[in-house]
Amino acid sequence: MSLQDQFTQAQADSKNLSERPDNMTMLKLYALFKQGSKGDASGERPGFTDMIGRAKFDAWDQLKGTSQDDAMQQYVDLVDDLKD
């Protein structure tokens, strides 16, 4: 199975986990997904009034320079760990 196929499967699997991950893990999943699918963060950082959007953007921005393939593999590995 190609990395892209594994990434797509992990996306589906992440929606069917037996329990919801904690907020920090959810941010990591979000950031890895965005980096794997879109590359480095772009656009403006959300303002102080959008704390959730700001946290999500910051988590994604911390992965700047990580290749999309590496981010996809990390995402797949994290979802696999959460499935256990």
What spans do the regions from the language model cover?
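A charge-rich, low-complexity, intrinsically flexible signal that marks solvent-exposed coils, linkers
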Residues: M1-D84
